[in-house]
Amino acid sequence: MTYIAHNHLAMRKFFYVGAIGLILFEALNVYFIMPMPGSQRSESIDLAYFLYHSRINFRALFILFMALGLIPNWRTHRWTTIILLGLSGLAYWASNYYMAADHMFYQPKSKAMAPAAENSIGQEKLVLGVVNGTEARAYPIQLIAYHHQVLDTVAGKVLMVTYCSVCRTGRVYEPSVDGKPETFRLVGMDHFNAMFEDSRTGSWWRQATGEAIAGDLKGKSIPEYPSRQMTLGQWLALYPGSRIFQPDTFFVDKYKGLARYDSGLGKSDLTRTDTSSWAEKSWVVGIVQNRKAKAYDWNRLKKERKIQDVVGGVPVLIVMGKDNMSFFAFKLPEDYEGFRMDGDSLRAGTVAWDLKGATPGNAPVLVPINAYQEFWHSWRTFHPGTARYE
């Protein structure tokens, strides 16, 4: 009898170990890749990746333990068994559905692109714009901040338009790895930045840099495609034939939650804006040239309207549009100094350029370069050697 009692107790312990282990595992599986207290400030990506990609093995082990002790525990502690089974199921559901990134933020079910005459987006709204050949397209940040990624084809080129509202990072990529087309899904975040998982290897890719940070492809990057951020009104002034991504009616309520995001009035502590300079959530404009990064204070750019500088040995010019939300960055030609803003034109002496960098005269064009508006904490984290323009 003593042996049977001890054996019965041991089997019951298997159930408790399995149930509690499964609950804790599901909690940790979410904790490291979602914005939980402390989770996004730790260097835990390798552990998070291991747990996530070992989830089938861990779940099988814990479920096996539960199965071994289920009947003995059911006979003597039925309500405890029911509660733990319910909590285990709830933890599994929350981890895989309720708190899974790709079940919280969906890609559009329908993708409508409208010309200016049929557009429903306000002229004051911020967009991420791309051009390929003669075709221009604009993607309102209010919309892509919810979706996190929108796949589109612009003049035959497949592009992945991405945005992370917690870092305020807009990037456009060609969804390919080593020249082969790839499919990505939103999987979570690391250091507050969205992460995507590729379909072939399950590697995790950072939205802000396009670099794989975990998995077989760690260290590789997907090609970035040039994009510019400005108000829709400014974009259409430069590209009147552009088509504009329209709201998907299925997600109208989701978009409403981001209605004031453009102006920095986020509804949560994750998306709010610091109005002072160089605080965690202050806006900066970041530039990278020749692998050298530099950040420029948004408040200073608004005040001075233009900043002429050298980054990585490259002379650059950053200017603010008259709407105080559109900004532009150019690589400068030699022998041109004294640039000034004249409405929405650039002038140096008697030469004038539009905000695409074109000039009707014989002067060299101003070559647009990628520049990014984002939170200071994001730029500093993903460009650890960055300089600051003082």
Question: Would you name each region that the model predicts?
Answer:
Residues 7-390:
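Mid-to-C-terminal functional-domain signal that highlights helix-capping/loop sites
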